Amino acid sequence: MKLLTDFLPIILFFVAYRIHGIYTATEVLIVAAILLMAWQWWRRGRVETMTWVSTLLILTFGGLTLYFHNDTFIKIKPSILYVLFAAALLFTHWREEPLLQRLMGGQLPAALPLSFWRRLNGYWIAFFLFGAVLNLIVAYAFSTGIWVDFKLFGMLAITVIFVLFQAVVISRALPQEAKDGDSSA
């Protein structure tokens, strides 16, 4: 359910683009992002940091797109978001507890070494920087229609493949008892 609600603004953007074009799609994206924030607040009593950052960028770059009637602003928004994510991960990379460890640490055994968390953190930094560059290439080298398709389908596919790769990396790093379901109980 969470995955669907997180992707709903992008899906609505895609549908609105196909029906009415980039400027209506941008308006729909702005409204959908605000509604997602309201829904998170109503449902959980708080808004996730990622939703705050994404909505702020959507309001800023979507607003600039509509004000100047120039779709370049909305096209660079994903790249800026990816660079911000990479920067946040990089900022904590050499600290006692990398950001990724703080975000995922409760879901994995505490026995995983700091070197593992730094490696995983580094993979995500590289992924976000790759996504930022790839988005800019598609935004500037191809039509808006191709960029919209890439934004929904291309980046989604790349993200799924990367997450599967991360699952393999994590599963190989888990202690044997965690893989076996802690059979000592």
From Swiss-Prot:
Query: Which Pfam families does the UniProt record give?
Result: IspA (PF04279)
What UniProt keywords are attached to this protein's entry?
A: Cell inner membrane, Cell membrane, Membrane, Transmembrane, Transmembrane helix
| Family of this protein | Belongs to the YciB family.
Annotated membrane topology is: Multi-pass membrane protein
| Compartment annotation | Cell inner membrane
Per the UniProt entry, the signal peptide is none
InterPro entries per record: YciB
Which domain of life, per UniProt?
A: Bacteria
**Species in which this protein is naturally found:** Acidithiobacillus ferrooxidans (strain ATCC 23270 / DSM 14882 / CIP 104768 / NCIMB 8455)
- The regions listed as transmembrane in this protein's record are 19-39, 49-69, 72-92, 122-142, 150-170
Q: Where is it found, in Gene Ontology cellular component terms?
A: plasma membrane
Q: What is this protein called?
A: Inner membrane-spanning protein YciB
Its annotated function is as follows: Plays a role in cell envelope biogenesis, maintenance of cell envelope integrity and membrane homeostasis.
Q: Does the keyword Transmembrane apply?
A: yes
The principal location of this protein is: membrane
| Organism placement in taxonomy | Bacteria, Pseudomonadati, Pseudomonadota, Acidithiobacillia, Acidithiobacillales
